[in-house]
């Protein structure tokens, strides 16, 4: 056993996260990878993929020096990509050849050489753009199509948030000459019965510059709200007085009927600009025309997005500090009763109790006042006040993403505190100082995980019948890689084991919380249920994370216990309020 422990500790010491530096190259040179080792970028990863899983996949290829899954600095959630570094350069091409597009947790990964220098990544030499791709074409099939022209550094089909192809992609060749050969051969070719367009990739900055140039010198005009009885001659006569027209088209459907819009192209920009200025919103044959610069579809979508975002921000600013969130409402409270409860504190612009699809109250609602001062007064007076036998919770309404960010920051702060304790204990042990490492307890949602619930509770599997959570029974955790690898020397024996338990508990808790929150959509409930489940032995928690059915069973039991706990709290609060009222009488 001691030999195994020593070997594991030795592996952990060797497996440290190191940043690989790229060699200096000139503009004329193709970026080269390091010859002393191999650094790979692994993308398209499922959010729960860990360093340990990647180690299991890549270690058979060669000796792994480090693995790092990149994570959000605040939420610690995976960003969907990682870096894998090998000691030997030969392992890099071998990993790309054998593992590229391998399924990892149901998603094909994308592997390419890591290029640390951003200027070389953004230079774009040898990078081509392909559009009008068939939805069935994925990264692998695109790579197979273009690999015949030369060595490919990266290949990617753009997808939406659901993983569905957006119809375009990019292929980055090592040599620019290979990219030009690919363009010449594939542009206009049929791929899955669709003709594709292939060209050198143009950077966003250059595209924006060209777009601004087109805007400044446009000659093509878009016209809509055209009367169905308008003839081609009338259409041309309307615009012809502003300058020479090179083309004028009234769009028609398959039956030859006008679709209500058309295009007019002038010979020069001045004529087009004058037509837009004078004819936009002009009434023609009883309809108000829209006349503007003709835009491509992506331009219109961008403008619509900007308008939507501006309207959203304006709405948020309008309700900032005046909209209240009220929860723990009794089922008997409707919109009118909610408004009556808050009417004494000021002018109410709206009051709404949220309901499900069957019309039943969801137990919370919103009250909007005319001024922030009125809203603040209502919070002071109504928060925790008993209404219809229930203590209300009243606070300023926040968007869901704001609440999540605040919770993530709180978790991050607790994590940093634990790390500080761990580092202090490690430093003391290295210096030979006496003392015992005692990590601070980790509570989710502000409740200790072993709070006993009063009354008969639904029993969770493997828990004692008194309703209290069992004591922690962490076994020795297995090797940890990347972000879990210890840095430097750590306390030995019991202190070392305690440190590993703390790190393991943190990692499991963060993964478990995400799954529980997805089920509850409630920060408080998710935190407390996570705390209850997390107190099970680590191996059992790992099984829950890997088995959704088993997790659902434990979640339902913990959720029932949590609901009972909440009901008991509310009953106690109501009894206390009634006793206080009797005392006053």
Curated annotation (Swiss-Prot):
Similarity comment: Belongs to the polyadenylate-binding protein type-1 family.
InterPro entries: Nucleotide-bd_a/b_plait_sf, PABP-dom, PABP_1234, PABP_HYD_C, PABP_RRM1, RBD_domain_sf, RRM2_I_PABPs, RRM_dom
Compartment(s) where it occurs, according to its Swiss-Prot or TrEMBL record: Cytoplasm; Nucleus
Keywords: Cytoplasm, mRNA processing, mRNA transport, Nucleus, Repeat, RNA-binding, Translation regulation, Transport
GO cellular component annotations of the record: cytoplasmic stress granule; cytosol; nucleus; post-mRNA release spliceosomal complex; ribonucleoprotein complex; ribosome
The PABC domain, residue ranges: 488-567
Listed name of the protein: Polyadenylate-binding protein, cytoplasmic and nuclear
Gene3D superfamilies given in the database record: 3.30.70.330, c-terminal domain of poly(a) binding protein
Domain RRM, residue spans: 38-116, 126-203, 219-296, 322-399
Species assigned in the record: Eremothecium gossypii (strain ATCC 10895 / CBS 109.51 / FGSC 9923 / NRRL Y-1056)
Source organism, top-level taxon: Eukaryota
Task performed by this protein: Binds the poly(A) tail of mRNA. Appears to be an important mediator of the multiple roles of the poly(A) tail in mRNA biogenesis, stability and translation. In the nucleus, involved in both mRNA cleavage and polyadenylation. Is also required for efficient mRNA export to the cytoplasm. Acts in concert with a poly(A)-specific nuclease (PAN) to affect poly(A) tail shortening, which may occur concomitantly with either nucleocytoplasmic mRNA transport or translational initiation.
Disordered as annotated region, ranges: 14-37
NCBIfam families, alphabetized: PABP-1234
This protein's record includes keyword Transport: yes
